[in-house]
């Protein structure tokens, strides 16, 4: 796709497959524009392939269009993250967009753990996620969102954010989450909306069904205070699989990210059958 001097067109396609002796390999890697990946890493051993996605270094601005496609084959295990926050800047009258497509086959495992997206003044953004799983797949993912510069008075006074996440299992729509938030919209202040918090996040996981005790334990990790609020729920899919959702509102991204990380650390061994190992990039 073409690009101009003042806007990016960028895309990335990644395919993970089982290799020799239980190793997961990055079998397909293609890109156009300024979107790349660092080399595949194996901090957990050969079974789990870790990849960091590099967004355009200057951030995302009006008119930019990014697309990410990830395909995890049966028997493969992949963990994807980003080395830093994704920054969305002033739109100058043109909407910026990012479309993420995740596919996991039966027997495949995926962690989708990008660091936060920060939407600055006058950003006009469309962020869509489409997750397609086969029964027998297992995956955990999240979105961490900050509206404006939290340390500034009257943060995010102009802008618009449209988000949409759809999760399918065997072609059936299991969960959809859509939001359209303008900087001056009442939903930012309403108790039934963002309740005045500048940071919000959602985590989803699909895989082996959690029992009642595990649901209680997960709920027990959720905070509830004037500055940080979390909640978790589980929806059965069938006798052996379920969808788990975790949401969090907060004043500071660091606190919200910590809640999401704790939830992921609890869910990962139970859903992905893999101990929780925090990506090393997050410590740099």
Swiss-Prot record:
Q: Which UniProt keywords apply?
A: Chaperone, Cytoplasm, Nickel insertion
In which domain of life is the source organism classified? Bacteria
Where does the record place a coiled coil? none
Question: Main role?
Answer: Required for maturation of urease via the functional incorporation of the urease nickel metallocenter.
| Entry-linked PANTHER family | UREASE ACCESSORY PROTEIN D
MF terms from GO for this chain are: nickel cation binding
The record lists the lineage as: Bacteria, Pseudomonadati, Pseudomonadota, Betaproteobacteria, Burkholderiales
Subcellular localization(s) per the UniProt record: Cytoplasm
Q: What does the subunit section of this Swiss-Prot or TrEMBL entry state? A: UreD, UreF and UreG form a complex that acts as a GTP-hydrolysis-dependent molecular chaperone, activating the urease apoprotein by helping to assemble the nickel containing metallocenter of UreC. The UreE protein probably delivers the nickel.
Protein name listed in UniProt: Urease accessory protein UreD
State the InterPro entries in the record: UreD
This entry carries the following GO cellular component terms, namely: cytoplasm
Q: Which residues form the signal peptide?
A: none
What family is it from?
Belongs to the UreD family.
């Amino acid at each position: 796709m073409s690009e101009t001097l003042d806007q990016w067109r960028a895309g990335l396609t990644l395919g993970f497959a089982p290799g020799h002796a239980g190793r997961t390999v990055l079998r397909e890697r293609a890109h156009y524009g300024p979107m790349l990946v660092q080399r595949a890493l194996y901090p957990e051993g050969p079974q789990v392939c870790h990849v960091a996605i590099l967004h355009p270094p200057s951030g995302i601005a009006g008119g930019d269009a990014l697309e990410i496609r990830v395909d995890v084959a049966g028997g493969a295990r992949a963990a994807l993250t980003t080395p830093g926050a994704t920054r969305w800047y002033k739109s100058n009258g043109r909407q910026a967009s990012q479309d993420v497509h995740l596919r996991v086959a039966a027997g495949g495992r995926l962690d989708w753990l990008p660091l936060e997206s920060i939407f600055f003044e006058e950003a006009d953004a469309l962020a869509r996620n489409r997750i397609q799983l086969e029964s027998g797949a297992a995956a955990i993912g999240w979105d961490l969102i900050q509206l404006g510069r939290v340390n500034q008075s009257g943060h995010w006074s102009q802008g618009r954010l449209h988000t949409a996440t759809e999760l399918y299992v065997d072609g059936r729509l299991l969960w959809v989450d859509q939001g359209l938030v303008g900087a001056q919209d009442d939903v930012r202040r309403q108790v039934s909306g963002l309740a005045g918090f500048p940071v919000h996040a959602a985590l989803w996981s699909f895989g082996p069904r959690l029992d009642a005790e595990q649901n209680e334990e997960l709920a027990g990790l959720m905070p509830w205070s004037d500055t940080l609020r979390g909640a978790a729920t589980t929806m059965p899919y069938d006798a052996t699989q379920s969808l788990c959702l975790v949401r969090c509102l907060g004043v500071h991204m660091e606190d919200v990210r910590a809640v999401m990380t704790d939830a992921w650390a609890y869910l990962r061994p139970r859903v992905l059958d893999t101990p929780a190992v925090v990506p090393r990039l997050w410590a740099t």
